[in-house]
Amino acid sequence: LGLTPATTILNRLSAADIAADPTLVATETGALTLAEGGALSSLGDSVLSGNLISAGGILLSNTYTGGNGAATDDRLTVTGTYLGENNGSGEGAWLALDTVLGDDDSATDRLVINGDATGTTSVRVNNAGGLGDKTLNGINLITVDGLAQDDTFL
């Protein structure tokens, strides 16, 4: 795993957590793999240059990471492909986001995938102060520029 000079990395081996801010580059294998029980936390605007294979947690939610309140300005961009792995017993890939539960234009954390997305990932949304409102298209939490199945993110 190679890192760019602009990368700040925190690796707590006992908890198997990686915090990326602002850039994490997967250069040797082209992929960052999160094992079950592992986590990638990304607060602010971060880029993973490469592919992401996850059987663990992707934490964009300040609530889950112990950050400062339920901020809705976190974004992780994966420049390659994404694979969410799930072992069928309810454990596996998951994504946590903070979102103001309101109309279509509500503030939210976002996951952006420039390539294809496959597999299954459960999505956990923390309400960041919204009172609820009607939506026409829904709140855009996840953008996949390539191909993805309807059940890739549940």
Predicted features and spans:
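Extracellular beta-solenoid/beta-roll
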Residues: 1-122, 126-127, 131-154
